[in-house]
Swiss-Prot record:
Pfam families assigned: Ribosomal_S19
Protein name as it appears in the record: Small ribosomal subunit protein uS19
Gene for this chain: rpsS
Xref: InterPro entries: Ribosomal_uS19, Ribosomal_uS19_bac-type, Ribosomal_uS19_CS, Ribosomal_uS19_SF
UniProt GO MF annotations: rRNA binding; structural constituent of ribosome
Free-text function comment from the UniProt entry: Protein S19 forms a complex with S13 that binds strongly to the 16S ribosomal RNA.
Family per similarity comment: Belongs to the universal ribosomal protein uS19 family.
Keyword Nucleotide-binding: no
Residues forming coiled coils: none
UniProt KW keywords: Ribonucleoprotein, Ribosomal protein, RNA-binding, rRNA-binding
């Protein structure tokens, strides 16, 4: 279910403050955040944001195709190791 249009998009205030601080400085650094729920705004384009996946911060470079999506969509929280492999020796018995 999508967010109500009357409410508008959401982004954490501390993340917006970090983006604004980076805009003032010449050097762009990776911005660490735990806010997977924040919507990507057009002002985020060109920045690298390290989003927490529950174990580590994964860097995500923001491009114009990502605007309107949530940060958490680009960093999966679960790692898939594949299904169990069939053992040829046990199958032959």
């Amino acid at each position: 279910m999508s967010r109500s249009l009357k409410k508008g998009p959401f982004a954490d205030a501390h993340l917006l403050n970090k983006i604004e601080a980076q805009a003032d400085s010449e050097k762009k650094q990776v911005i660490k955040t735990w806010s997977r729920r924040s919507t990507i705004f057009p002002s985020f384009i060109g920045y690298t944001i390290a989003v927490y996946d529950g174990r580590k911060h994964v860097p995500v470079f923001i491009s114009d195709d990502m605007v309107g999506h949530k940060l958490g969509e680009f960093v999966p929280t679960r790692t898939f190791h594949g299904h169990g492999n069939d053992d040829k020796k046990t199958k032959a018995r």
